[in-house]
């Protein structure tokens, strides 16, 4: 063992280097994180560090970054820093440990000199030993150490005077460590051999150590503080002292004597003078003598007074000293330092956890040592100080009172039970003291009574990590440590703690109750919980709820006003109490010395202790299931043999536990024994669920599956049935883990159906009891097995409170079913107020495990015995009126099976402060057994094996599980046409669950109703996807009106979907109605021709089958509220379309959103959950099951009512996954039907249209003189203006309405159509100027340009006229074709202003005379520009009846058109093409400005 000894400033510390990794640096500095902490030296030059050399046991010594040298084993190394010497010694030898018996010795002398030494250590035997001597003294049962010479250390500090020893104190002398234990044993750890007169012995083991790790409290030694009353008497009054001096006594007679002498000289009188002189002389002498005599007597009296009172004070001093020492000893005993507690813990002292919640001091803490008030009383008896002087004796008396009024160097304590406590000071000091405070509470208070919750900064985790081993940090209600250091741990722990405390707060008479465990919250990070609701309890006075709070901060301003006790830490050695009981005080104290190194060992030791509570007796505390059968392996039970030999008709007795060491307790539910029905009660942690599992397993082991079976009622899905899920005896688990409103109805329907089934079998075989039927079955006369059915309900109290009718009917059914072999066991945590007369009268046996209080015990047993049970699994069995009343220990089926197992780990997990985090699973070899297998698992495996071996078939279960919430339609595919599974029906009264199909031609239109979010749209998608899987796009056309939230959007790309409509596509919907009406008329005509009335017959007879048309409207509420006209059309559509193969499916959030006339046309109605349930009654009346707020849960009304769960269109875990899967399935269908013709969509104009897009997308026909103007608004087909037929065209429109764009569109085509000549007159903004560069275009700017163009055109026309006349003469005029000569004008007014009358006349003549020769006149302008004027050109233009209108028809009078009411505005890009008084609304393409880019 390698130890480093550090000597400095009359102190010594040691560090075990063997426990440190070789690469770990050893540091000596002022910080607590250093390996050795020396807080009294600032280390301004840097900390001292030791680095191990690669070879040997040498260390290099550094001061800061400077290497000072090398330290070797058994060689001293001294260095200096901050003018302080520090001596380092490295020892490498292994120390020896010896124990010696001190006997009756009151003094043990330890010395390096052999004379009179009880322990002699020769300094020459150890290199670092020196001449020194000290004595161990025993007085009054306590030891002390008295140094006499040399250096002696106590707990690492040098001592110079006699010092009392406390438990765990360690004496260091010449590298020998000594410790007094057990009052008469001396432990010595030494490196050098020594001689001693003491007897060596072996340290005996205490009872606590022998029973370790089991720990049980012993009677606590409680010492009272001395409360004597010490009265001080006044000293006798000091005698009055005259102030007259000697001169004042002799002066009067002396003066008289002198006067008489003078008189005698002046006037002699003879004898008179002599007499007077004698008298005055005598007076003088006697006065002097009397003065000295009185003075001597006063001195003697005063000496006596002082001697007597000093003796009195000395006695009082002894009395007070004894009281003071006693008080200090009591305080030291009850409030030892944390270091002493660590020592006591290492010795497994019986003082561990000696306090309980009933102790008055259970939350008192030691802060350190200081001056405390005496517990005894000191006063002065009688007398009035006002009437006497304070003399020296009085002052001594008062001084003694002042000295003993306070006890110095005594433990200073605070009581956390008084209210929240605040700690302020430097963070490092406060944290260091928190270690001690938590350690004290952990030592004295058991984890049964006290739990910690520590809220700190995450970066400080390493500082507090040792505390996680303290059992008090394990939360009682969850598997987590009481460490809160980030948002995750805060959210995981504080919410549940808040609920727990709130439950306490809501308890009646909470002020009188004592809650367990008591929670101590230690908070160093207030910010983390600053907004949490638990602060309402932590910041207030709530100790009666079992919570206390310690808050640490750097200043008191950071604390709340609710602090009851405030402790300030001034520095590393001093502190004071500023507030106590909410009153300002100032109580200084010195901090206890504390070493953190042993903290983790302390906490781990406490963690290993198993604190036992209660009294043991002969009943075993634990019994495994296999022990009931005296078996070590499951094969030894003989299950198969028991099945073959057991007879349930005679007895149902099975073992459930032990009532003595070898006395087994049996429970027999035969009606002639303990049965048929009973009750079980046990609070949380009592072993109630384990008892039920043991009883179920015991029945399964004893009886054949055809003789005993179970139906478990696990209302909240607690997992009681989980271990038995595969055994043949379990017929089902009735659970309501989903919170179904139909739980009671479904469960009762299942149970009643089972009773009816049994009654039918009894009638069939003419028996009236289960025992008779069992005999017939065993004889082979009855074919159907009928086992005893055990109905076992766990947590029936909660079930009764939420489903009272169900429990009442269940008990009634069990009463009726007793002869049918039905047994009922009701289990609850809290029987108080739950067991009514009906339950009690039908329960013959009762099992009471540990219950919460006497009231619960009396409720089930009629006595309070069960309230006193403390052992898990312990309980009372009571049958009838105490016919049987036994205390027993139930067997534990969850015990590990075969403790001597082998194999590998099957699970690896990280143990965190908040629980277990699984990392991986490792498969074990086939021949290796799982070391985590329990007895119940082993027995269940054996039962399954025997079942397979015997070929036993599991009986059908009367209980069908609740419908799943997500069922994909792919589980029940629809392979037939006109037969589509769309939902899964639940019929518990028939014990049947099966898919239900929709037959299109029989079930007709579909109405789907339900509130938002419950699956209407998804149901519609299910239908459509089912249709698409079976029908081809040629057989089925789908129209989707998606007025909802877009759920059906992925189906818009189905190959079967003709079109997809949104709410704002009114024009598209209008076109659809036109199309569908035309289709209805067409189909009616075809049916009349075939003389048939239904599509089924038509498709059977006709060679060309008609496709089914399925119209789907999602969110019909919109139609009802905003599309009134469309609603009437849909009503007609639903009425007329069904027989024609046109079907209708709608969804709505309210039934009232659908008109009754339409509702009557919906043969199939599907109702999801409705917020107003009464709406559904108009469709299906009063159902036997209530609709639950579960998406997809529906009531289907066809020829009957069905309760069902709708299928999902795809298999997905959530809505996002479903959306993606739906798109994927649609893509697959697109690929599948890619080669087939898909239904034509409703033609709609594009949002924007260019001339390029018009020519490419719509495949324009190339016809001579036919100019494509745009797309027809209705048919979305190209509309042409035939210049060969109509010759001239007006372009009418207001400013900025697109006239120039129309001219561009016409120019583009005319230029490409090889027009012979185009005259182009532009508007003022020159919008057509870029056409001037075209070879066929003459850009006309001036009057002269126009005249020249007219001259050229006239020459052409004269030539053509001659040709035309010649062709007429020859009869070939119809075959004569001329290329077009076009005059286009953008802005007719500006054109009229440019030309004169002569040009007007010539152009008017062109229009009249040359139109047949290829002249076309295309002017553009405002309609008013064409209607004004009477010149020849204007007159001729007024005759034109062909135009392109870019305005409302009613706003112009140039071309007469029919009047249209409420004519809509013409939007930009739209216009009318008018030919001979008939208009077509068209979308006009936008022509690009640069023609070159388009070429």
From Swiss-Prot:
Name of the protein: ESX secretion system protein YukB
Membrane-spanning segments: 246-266, 270-290
InterPro entries: Firmicutes_EssC_C, Firmicutes_EssC_N, FtsK/SpoIIIE/SftA, FtsK_dom, P-loop_NTPase
Entry's Gene Ontology molecular function annotations: ATP binding; DNA binding
Disulphide bridges, residue numbers: none
Sequence ranges assigned to domain FtsK in this UniProt record: 661-858, 993-1177
Cell location: Cell membrane
Origin species: Bacillus subtilis (strain 168)
Keywords linked to the UniProt accession: ATP-binding, Cell membrane, Membrane, Nucleotide-binding, Repeat, Transmembrane, Transmembrane helix
Domain of life where this protein originates: Bacteria
PROSITE patterns the UniProt entry points to: FTSK (PS50901)
Observed effect of gene inactivation: Cells lacking this gene are blocked in YukE secretion. They display an increased bacteriophage SPP1 resistance phenotype.
Gene3D superfamilies for this protein: P-loop containing nucleotide triphosphate hydrolases
Chain residues that bind ATP: 682-689, 1010-1017
GO CC annotation terms, alphabetical: plasma membrane
Chain's role: Required for YukE secretion. Probable component or regulator of the ESX/ESAT-6-like secretion system (BsEss).
NCBIfam families: T7_EssCb_Firm
Membrane topology: Multi-pass membrane protein
Family as reported in the entry's similarity comment: Belongs to the EssC family.
Main location: membrane
């Amino acid at each position: 063992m390698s130890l480093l000894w550090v000597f400095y400033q009359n102190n010594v510390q040691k560090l075990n280097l063997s426990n440190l990794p070789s690469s770990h640096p050893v540091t000596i500095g002022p910080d607590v994180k250093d390996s050795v902490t020396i807080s009294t030296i600032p280390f301004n030059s840097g900390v001292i560090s030791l680095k191990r050399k690669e070879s040997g046991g040498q260390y290099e010594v550094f001061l800061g970054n400077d290497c000072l040298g090398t330290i070797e084993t058994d060689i001293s190394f001294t260095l200096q820093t901050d003018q302080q010497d520090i001596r380092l010694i490295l020892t490498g030898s292994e120390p020896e440990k010896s124990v010696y018996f001190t006997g009756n010795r009151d003094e043990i002398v330890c010395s390096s000199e052999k004379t009179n030494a009880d322990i002699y250590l020769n300094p020459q035997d150890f290199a670092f030993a020196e001449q020194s001597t000290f004595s161990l003294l025993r007085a009054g049962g306590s030891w002390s150490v008295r140094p006499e010479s040399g250096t002696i250390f106590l707990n690492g500090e040098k001592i110079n005077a006699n010092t009392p020893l406390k438990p765990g104190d360690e004496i260091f002398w010449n590298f020998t460590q000594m410790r007094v234990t057990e009052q008469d044993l001396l432990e010595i750890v030494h490196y050098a051999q020594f001689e001693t007169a003491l007897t060596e012995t072996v340290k005996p083991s205490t009872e606590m150590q022998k029973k370790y790790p089991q720990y049980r409290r012993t009677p606590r030694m409680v010492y009272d503080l001395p409360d004597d009353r010490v009265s001080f008497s006044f000293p006798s009054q000091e005698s009055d002292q005259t102030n007259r001096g000697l001169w004042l006594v002799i002066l009067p007679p002396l003066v008289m004597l002198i006067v008489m002498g003078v008189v005698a000289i002046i006037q002699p009188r003879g004898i008179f003078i002599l007499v007077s002189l004698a008298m005055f002389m005598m007076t003088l002498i006697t006065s002097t003598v009397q003065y000295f005599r009185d003075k001597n007597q006063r001195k003697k009296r005063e000496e006596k007074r002082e001697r007597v009172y000093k003796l009195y004070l000395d006695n009082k001093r002894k009395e007070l000293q004894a009281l003071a020492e006693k008080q200090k000893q009591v305080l030291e005993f009850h409030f030892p330092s944390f270091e002493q507690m660590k020592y006591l813990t290492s010795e497994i002292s019986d003082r561990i956890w000696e306090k309980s919640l009933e102790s008055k001091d259970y939350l008192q803490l030691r802060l350190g040592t200081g001056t405390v008030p005496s517990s005894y009383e000191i006063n002065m008896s009688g007398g009035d100080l006002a009437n006497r002087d304070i003399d020296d004796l009085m002052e001594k008396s008062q001084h003694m009172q002042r000295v003993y009024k306070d006890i110095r160097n005594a433990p200073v304590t605070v009581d956390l039970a008084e209210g929240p406590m605040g700690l302020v000071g430097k963070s490092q000091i406060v944290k260091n003291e928190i270690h001690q405070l938590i350690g004290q509470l952990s030592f004295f208070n058991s984890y049964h009574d006290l739990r910690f919750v520590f809220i700190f900064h995450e970066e400080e985790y390493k500082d507090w990590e040792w505390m996680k081993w303290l059992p008090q940090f394990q939360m009682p209600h969850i598997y987590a440590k009481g460490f809160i250091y980030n948002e995750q741990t805060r959210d995981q722990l504080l919410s549940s703690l808040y609920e727990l405390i709130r439950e306490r707060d809501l308890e009646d008479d909470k002020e009188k109750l004592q809650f367990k465990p008591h929670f101590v919250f230690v908070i160093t990070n207030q910010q983390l919980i600053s907004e949490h609701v638990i602060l309402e309890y932590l910041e207030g006075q709530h100790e009666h709820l079992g919570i206390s709070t310690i808050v640490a901060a750097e200043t008191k301003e950071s604390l709340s006003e609710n602090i009851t006790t405030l402790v300030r830490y001034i520095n590393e050695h001093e502190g004071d109490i500023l507030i106590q009981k909410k009153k300002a005080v100032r109580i200084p104290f010195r901090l206890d010395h504390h070493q953190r190194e042993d903290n983790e060992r302390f906490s781990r030791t406490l963690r290993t202790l198993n604190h036992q509570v209660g009294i043991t007796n002969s009943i075993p505390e634990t019994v495994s299931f296999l022990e009931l059968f005296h078996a070590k392996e499951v094969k030894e039970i003989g299950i198969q043999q028991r099945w073959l030999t057991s007879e349930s008709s005679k007895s149902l007795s099975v073992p459930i536990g032990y009532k003595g060491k070898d006395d087994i307790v049996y429970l027999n539910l035969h009606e002639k024994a303990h049965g048929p029905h009973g009750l079980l009660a046990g609070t949380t942690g009592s072993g109630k669920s384990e008892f039920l599992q043991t009883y179920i397993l015991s029945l399964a082991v004893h009886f054949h599956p055809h003789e005993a079976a179970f139906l478990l009622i696990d209302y909240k899905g607690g997992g009681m049935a989980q271990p038995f899920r595969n055994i043949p005896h379990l017929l089902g688990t009735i659970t309501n883990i989903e919170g179904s409103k139909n739980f009671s109805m479904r469960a009762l329907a299942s149970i009643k159906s089972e009773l009816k089934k049994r009654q039918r079998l009894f009638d069939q075989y003419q028996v009236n009891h289960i025992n008779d039927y069992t005999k017939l079955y065993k004889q082979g006369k009855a074919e159907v097995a009928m086992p005893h059915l055990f109905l076992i309900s766990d947590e029936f109290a909660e079930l009764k409170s939420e489903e009272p009718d169900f429990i009442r009917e269940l008990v009634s059914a069990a009463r009726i079913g007793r002869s049918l072999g039905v047994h009922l066991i009701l289990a609850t945590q809290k029987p108080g107020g739950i067991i009514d007369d009906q339950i009690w009268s039908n329960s013959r046996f009762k099992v009471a495990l540990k219950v919460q209080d006497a009231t619960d015990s009396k409720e089930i047993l009629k006595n309070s015995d069960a309230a006193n049970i403390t052992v898990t699994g312990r309980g009372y069995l009571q049958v009838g009126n105490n016919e049987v009343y036994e205390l027993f220990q139930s067997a534990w089926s969850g015990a590990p099976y075969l403790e001597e197992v082998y194999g590998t780990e099957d699970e690896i997990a990280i143990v965190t402060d908040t629980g277990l985090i699984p990392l991986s699973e490792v498969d074990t070899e086939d021949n290796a057994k799982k070391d985590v297998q329990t007895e119940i698992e082993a027995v269940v495996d054996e039962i399954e094996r025997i079942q397979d071996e015997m070929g036993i078939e599991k009986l059908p279960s009367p209980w069908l599980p609740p419908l799943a919430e997500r069922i994909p339609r792919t589980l029940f595919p629809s392979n037939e046409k006109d037969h589509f599974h769309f939902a899964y029906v639940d019929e518990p009264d028939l014990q049947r669950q099966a898919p239900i199909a929709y037959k299109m031609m029989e079930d007709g239109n579909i109405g789907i109703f339900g509130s938002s979010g419950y699956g209407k749209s998804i149901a519609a998608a299910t239908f459509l996807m089912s249709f698409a899987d079976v029908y081809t796009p040629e057989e089925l056309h789908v129209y989707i009106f998606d007025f909802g939230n877009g759920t059906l959007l992925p189906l818009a790309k189905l190959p079967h979907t003709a079109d997809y409509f949104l709410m704002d596509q009114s024009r598209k919907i209008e076109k659809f109605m036109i199309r569908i009406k035309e289709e209805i008329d067409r189909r009616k005509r075809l049916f009349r021709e075939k003389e048939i009335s239904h599509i089924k017959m038509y498709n059977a007879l006709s060679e060309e089958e008609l496709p089914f048309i399925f119209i789907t409207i999602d969110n019909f509420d919109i139609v009802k509220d905003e599309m009134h006209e469309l609603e009437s059309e849909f009503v007609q559509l639903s009425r007329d379309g069904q027989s024609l193969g046109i079907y209708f499916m709608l969804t709505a959030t309210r039934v009232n959103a659908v008109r009754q006339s339409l509702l009557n046309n919906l043969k199939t109605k599907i109702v999801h959950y409705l917020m107003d349930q009464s709406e559904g009654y108009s469709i299906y009346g009063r159902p036997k099951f209530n609709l639950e707020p579960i998406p997809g849960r529906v009531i289907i009304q066809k020829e009957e009512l069905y309760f069902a769960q709708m299928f999902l269109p795809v298999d997905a875990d959530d809505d996002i996954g479903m959306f993606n899967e739906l798109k994927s399935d649609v893509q697959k269908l697109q690929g599948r039907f890619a080669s087939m013709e898909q239904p034509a969509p409703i033609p709609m104009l594009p949002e924007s249209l260019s001339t390029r897009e018009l020519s490419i997308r719509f495949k324009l026909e190339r016809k001579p003189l036919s100019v494509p103007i745009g797309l027809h608004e209705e048919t979305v087909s190209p509309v042409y203006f035939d210049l060969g037929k109509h010759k001239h065209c007006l372009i009418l429109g207001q400013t900025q309405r697109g006239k120039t764009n129309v001219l561009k569109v016409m120019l583009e085509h005319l230029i490409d159509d090889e027009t012979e000549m185009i005259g182009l007159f532009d508007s003022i903004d020159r919008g057509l100027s870029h056409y001037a560069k075209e070879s066929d275009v003459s850009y006309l700017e001036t009057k002269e340009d126009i005249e020249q163009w007219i001259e050229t055109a006239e020459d052409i026309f004269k030539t053509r006229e001659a040709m035309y006349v010649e062709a007429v003469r020859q009869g070939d005029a119809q075959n004569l074709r001329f290329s077009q000569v076009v005059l286009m004008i953008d802005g007719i007014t500006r054109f009229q202003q440019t030309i004169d009358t002569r040009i007007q006349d010539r152009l008017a003549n062109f229009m009249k005379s040359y139109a047949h020769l290829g002249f076309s006149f295309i002017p553009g302008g405002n309609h008013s520009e064409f209607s004004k004027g009477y010149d020849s050109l204007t007159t001729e233009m007024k005759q034109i009846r062909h135009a392109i209108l870019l305005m409302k028809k009613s706003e112009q009078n140039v071309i007469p058109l029919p009047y249209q009411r409420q004519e809509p505005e013409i939007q930009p890009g739209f216009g009318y093409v008018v030919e001979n008084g008939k208009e077509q609304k068209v979308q006009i393409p936008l022509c690009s400005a640069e023609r070159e880019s388009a070429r």
